[in-house]
Amino acid sequence: MTEDELQTYVVHWLQVALPLGSVFHHSPNEGKRHVAYKMRLKKLGMAAGWPDLEIFVPETGWRDPADQGPIMVELKRPKGGSLSANQKDIQERLKCCGVYCVTAKRLAHVEAYLKPLLHLRGTSQADIIRQMCEA
């Protein structure tokens, strides 16, 4: 499975499993680009190594309201995927700012990380997506 395929499953799962009122976003900062375009994006604030998904959850979605904060998810392909030096640096800096960060190679890793923090919705759609991803 590619990282893009994994992210597609994770996005579909988040849409049906996150607490109501949650929002998430993907900043398309991966891939090869023309040098001039990369420079433009950098001027606009793009940071190399930024996680794949940013998740924001309303207060009522947290198991412990004291745990509130942004959640960042970095996805890696299941076989051979590893964090770059920029990604490691960004994750450490985000953690110092009180941001939850996880690196995951499977949907099950994302779910296991979020389950103790959030009131996830248990839906049949979430179950189907999980089964499809793990197949």
Model-predicted segments: where are they?
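Catalytic phosphate/metal-binding cores of nucleic-acid and nucleotide-processing enzymes, i.e., regions
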Residues: 1-135
